[in-house]
Amino acid sequence: METFNEDSVVHEPSTETFYISFKSGAKAFINYKVEKNDTIDLWHTEVPDEGRGTGIGGFLASKSIKDLAAANSSKTVILSCSYLQHYYKKNEAKFVDFKNIKMA
């Protein structure tokens, strides 16, 4: 099984994506959209079969939510992806320092 750390996560603002690449070339990713009304909507998460059940989705969720919330404190970070909503509810204590995270 591959191991990942924070340096494994790539943020690509031009495509509004956070991702982790596997050796096979597959990617786990989270898409977001910067809206005109001072919000950032994290709307989609996808993990390839080889990454399911490994915790990579949660790792990617935590990193992307925290990074966007910290870098955009004057904007509201909206979690409209059902996976991210579930992850956030289950791990709310990790995000207590971020007052700009909301559920869709």
Regions found by a protein language model. Give the residues of each.
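Conserved catalytic-core motifs of GNAT/GCN5-like acyltransferases
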Residues: 95-104
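A conserved beta-strand-loop-helix scaffold within acyl/acetyltransferase catalytic domains
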Residues: 11-17, 22-40, 46
